[in-house]
Swiss-Prot record:
Alphabetical keyword list: Acetylation, Calcium, Chlorophyll, Chloroplast, Chromophore, Electron transport, Herbicide resistance, Iron, Magnesium, Manganese, Membrane, Metal-binding, Oxidoreductase, Phosphoprotein, Photosynthesis, Photosystem II, Plastid, Thylakoid, Transmembrane, Transmembrane helix, Transport
Protein name, as recorded: Photosystem II protein D1
Sites where the protein binds pheophytin a: 126
Organism encoding this protein: Landoltia punctata
Annotated PANTHER family: PHOTOSYSTEM II D2 PROTEIN, PHOTOSYSTEM II PROTEIN D1
Enzyme Commission numbers on file: 1.10.3.9
Positions marked as site (Tyrosine radical intermediate): 161
Residues recorded as bearing N-acetylthreonine in the entry: 2
Length: 353
């Protein structure tokens, strides 16, 4: 009898670390993207929580009128926010060591830049980690592609828009009321409701909700009975079972008769691709719209476009929206400038007799 002894090479510490990082057997997959994702998202989350609770007021407009955003300075969950970095800083990279003191850094809104830049890097790494895990499991890469839509939207409002406007102070505040303020000011300055890419985004989000509800209700209504009346229908499914849990033919027949035949998918794969692609493409377009409006390529302007035979303006909904935009623009940053840009651009009449 012959015994064969294998000599096992001792794995280095670095090799063991690499194997652990890339192992799909871990309870939570780390991955090389995760090595960067974990510290960046932890940093963004930690600073956000601390600043939301205790950050002092920030001179957002750069005019020595600080705006309070934290809970300890009089706000609640609804009104609180991380106030964007001061207009006095503009687009400058503003880490703590660039300020003369921590107090100055806080006064100029340094935490906003820190949170946003770490957050954007972190969510990109999360997207890369989705692709990495899919690759290692032999899956197709579409999960990461779908996640690129919210990543693009976050990038548009937190990075591209400030770059186009010339200051991080124009970025979206990190809070509920701050988000609404950002939306109102964006409409006032860029007429986003009249931009076709925003319209596509609305169709994507609301259409995606509708299709999700339609699909879920159709599947739930055409489950194959596996239980009695006294049991939950959910008990009729076992994780990993090979047979279908619902009758797609019945669902197809129902919906085809409810609308018309070709409104109903007869292929489960193309149906689920459609459910993923519709909202993703819509949000891509909205992100692209924000990114173009960042550089002042704004929504359609149909103001005073309808006149009668005497040249008198016949007001349309476009004119109503324009009046609302002017009102919103007058009210925001009211101490930073006396007139909205649209009014300030008009040449003043001569007062010389």
């Amino acid at each position: 009898m012959t015994a064969i002894l294998e000599r096992r090479e001792s794995t280095s510490l670095w090799g063991r670390f690499c194997n652990w990082v890339t192992s799909t057997e871990n309870r939570l997959y780390i991955g090389w993207f995760g090595v960067l994702m974990i510290p960046t998202l932890l940093t963004a989350t930690s600073v956000f929580i601390i600043a939301f609770i205790a950050a002092p007021p920030v001179d957002i407009d750069g005019i020595r009128e600080p705006v309070s955003g934290s809970l300890l300075y009089g706000n609640n969950i609804i009104s609180g926010a991380i106030i964007p970095t001061s207009a006095a800083i503009g687009l400058h990279f503003y880490p703590i060591w660039e300020a003369a003191s921590v107090d100055e850094w806080l006064y100029n809104g340094g935490p906003y830049e820190l949170i946003v830049l770490h957050f954007l890097l972190g969510v990109r790494c999360y997207m890369g980690r989705e692709w990495e895990l899919s690759f290692r499991l032999g899956m197709r890469p579409w999960i990461a592609v779908a996640y690129s839509a919210p990543v693009a939207a976050a990038t548009a409002v937190f990075l591209i828009y400030p770059i186009g406007q010339g200051s991080f102070s124009d970025g979206m505040p990190l809070g509920i009321s701050g988000t609404f303020n950002f939306m109102i000011v964006f409409q006032a300055e860029h007429n986003i409701l009249m931009h076709p890419f925003h319209m596509l985004g609305v169709a994507g989000v609301f259409g995606g909700s509708l299709f999700s509800a339609m699909h879920g209700s159709l599947v739930t209504s055409s489950l194959i009975r596996e239980t009695t009346e006294n049991e939950s229908a959910n008990e009729g499914y076992r994780f990993g079972q090979e047979e279908e849990t619902y009758n797609i033919v019945a669902a197809h027949g129902y919906f085809g008769r409810l609308i018309f035949q070709y409104a109903s998918f007869n292929n489960s794969r193309s149906l689920h691709f459609f459910l993923a692609a519709w909202p993703v493409i819509g949000i891509w377009f909205t992100s692209l719209g924000i990114s173009t409006m960042a550089f002042n390529l704004n929504g359609f302007n149909f103001n005073q476009s309808v006149v009668d035979s005497q040249g008198r303006v016949i007001n349309t909904w476009a004119d109503i929206i324009n009046r609302a935009n002017l009102g919103m623009e007058v009210m925001h940053e009211r101490n930073a400038h006396n007139f909205p840009l649209d009014l300030a651009a008009v040449e003043a009449p001569s007062t010389i007799g």
